[in-house]
């Protein structure tokens, strides 16, 4: 069974008025909306993800003294007794739950409502970063994505949305590691970076995890 996963098509990422606008993200609205309705694709299920942060989320630069957005930051494991760390990035405040910025863009939300499409939220625990729609960066806390896919007998996932080098990539890798046949549809994604080398590296990482990377 095939499931389409639409990643983070939210105002803060897609609208020019958003706080963390992905370049050319608006270009995806109509194509992804059409893709969700494409009968030839034979989607068994569609899942839409959202960043859904509390205002004090650890990934927001404003919540750290003397830190600016896009600066590097060392995340420490939230698990007591675990001294592991991960290097990451601090972001502008974005997708604070129940605000305009966290809302799905209208065309996607309309389909969610009319077709009763599943929404999976991530990033709602204050003390940890998330990119994958399956779990936090530590793989400690799990969202309900995998349980939903298993419940509906999914064995194949197709992933679209933003941003390619962050949440799309992480979600695809998680899906592949969980045993799903995974495909990223590049024409239906957009990266934050405009560096071709960054995009090439993402493609290589995806392919190294046996993920299909195709245009459409």
Swiss-Prot record:
Subcellular location, record wording: Cytoplasm; Nucleus; Peroxisome
Expression induction or repression: Induced during the stationary phase of growth, by calorie restriction, by various hyperosmotic shocks or by low-intensity stress (at protein level).
GO molecular function list: metal ion binding; nicotinamidase activity
EC code: 3.5.1.19
Binding site for Zn(2+): 51, 53, 94
Active site as annotated: 8, 122, 167
Cross-referenced CDD domains: nicotinamidase (cd01011)
Highest taxon of source: Eukaryota
Catalysed transformations (reactions): nicotinamide + H2O = nicotinate + NH4(+)
Enzyme class: hydrolase
Gene Ontology annotations for the cellular component aspect, listed alphabetically: chromosome, telomeric region; cytoplasm; nucleus; peroxisome
GO biological process terms held by the UniProt record: negative regulation of DNA amplification; nicotinate nucleotide salvage; rDNA heterochromatin formation; subtelomeric heterochromatin formation
Additional remark text: Has a cis-peptide bond at 162-Val-Ala-163.
Protein purpose: Catalyzes the deamidation of nicotinamide, an early step in the NAD(+) salvage pathway. Positively regulates SIR2-mediated silencing and longevity by preventing the accumulation of intracellular nicotinamide, an inhibitor of SIR2, during times of stress. Also acts on nicotinyl hydroxamate.
Annotated protein name in UniProt: Nicotinamidase
């Amino acid at each position: 069974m095939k499931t389409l996963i639409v990643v983070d098509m939210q105002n803060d990422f897609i609208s020019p008025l958003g706080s963390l606008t992905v370049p050319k993200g608006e270009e995806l609205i109509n194509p992804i909306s059409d893709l969700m309705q494409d009968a030839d694709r034979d989607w068994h299920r569609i899942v839409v993800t959202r960043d859904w942060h509390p205002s004090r989320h650890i990934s927001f630069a404003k919540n750290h003294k003397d830190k600016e957005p896009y600066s590097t930051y060392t995340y420490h494991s939230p698990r007591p007794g675990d001294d592991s760390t991960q290097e990451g990035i601090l972001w502008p405040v974005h997708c604070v739950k129940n605000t305009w910025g966290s809302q799905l863009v209208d065309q996607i939300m309309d389909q969610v409502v009319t077709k009763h499409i599943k929404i999976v939220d991530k990033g709602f625990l204050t003390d940890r970063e998330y990119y994958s729609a399956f779990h936090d960066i530590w793989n400690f806390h799990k969202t309900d994505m995998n349980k939903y896919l298993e419940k509906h007998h999914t064995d194949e996932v197709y992933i679209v949305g933003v941003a390619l080098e962050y949440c799309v990539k992480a979600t695809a890798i998680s899906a592949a590691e969980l045993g799903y046949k995974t495909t990223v549809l590049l024409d239906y994604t957009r990266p934050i970076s405009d560096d071709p080398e960054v995009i090439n590296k993402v493609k290589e990482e995806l392919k190294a995890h046996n993920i299909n990377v195709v245009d459409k």
